[in-house]
């Protein structure tokens, strides 16, 4: 019992992770590593759309084809759909099972491989799946208790993270709307023309050329850029005679300007 309690405390310590620790490209790598070390298995977390949020492999079990899923950070649609249909923890699925994470071509190499899938949901919202697997050792009741706890803890963390992201998105959109509202009619035309010159979210432009093309003064473009830059929406850098380098920091500006029909 004391051993189980110690492992449980290690898992619940995940909740103490700060927001900054969840900003990485794979924010749950550290969590899956911790879980894999505690339960002695391979582990990964995917969201409900199949995006890989984190993984850690203690043991070699997959082929190059499957490891490509981890490199591209997205799981196949059919596997994700199957995982989303699992509403309670499915334990010790054999390699022959459709939801086994062991690929068909490696099942002869790992005939005793076992997969366990635990749904991650909070307040009725399906957020993803926690998947763990071993080459040849059954997941016992103690392991499954820890998996249930881990899926709940990760679910709470995911929900909190999503709420924080939603709040950030709202703040970003509000900042864009307020900045655009400060622009004059001519400045809005200038911003629309500038955004059209970019290659994606960044590019090089020459203010005088744009000004001549749309029939405004260069100072209008300069003022518009200053307003957007002071609002943190863009950043710019003079290239001297070559023009100005511009990078969009908040991409909502494209949609906001388009809505104004400029």
UniProtKB/Swiss-Prot annotation:
GO BP terms in the entry: negative regulation of DNA-templated transcription
Origin: domain of life: Bacteria
InterPro entries associated with the record: ArsR-like_HTH, CodY, GAF-like_dom_sf, GTP_trans_reg_CodY_C, Transc_reg_CodY_N, WH-like_DNA-bd_sf, WH_DNA-bd_sf
Residue ranges for the DNA-binding region feature of this UniProt entry: 207-226
Keyword entries, A-Z: Cytoplasm, DNA-binding, Repressor, Transcription, Transcription regulation
Chain positions covered by the region annotation GAF domain: 1-159
GO CC aspect terms: cytoplasm
MF annotations from Gene Ontology: DNA binding; DNA-binding transcription factor activity; GTP binding
Compartment annotation: Cytoplasm
Family classification: Belongs to the CodY family.
NCBIfam families: codY_Gpos, PRK04158.1
Function field: DNA-binding global transcriptional regulator which is involved in the adaptive response to starvation and acts by directly or indirectly controlling the expression of numerous genes in response to nutrient availability. During rapid exponential growth, CodY is highly active and represses genes whose products allow adaptation to nutrient depletion.
Name assigned to this protein: Global transcriptional regulator CodY
Organism this protein belongs to: Streptococcus pneumoniae serotype 4 (strain ATCC BAA-334 / TIGR4)
Gene name tied to this protein: codY
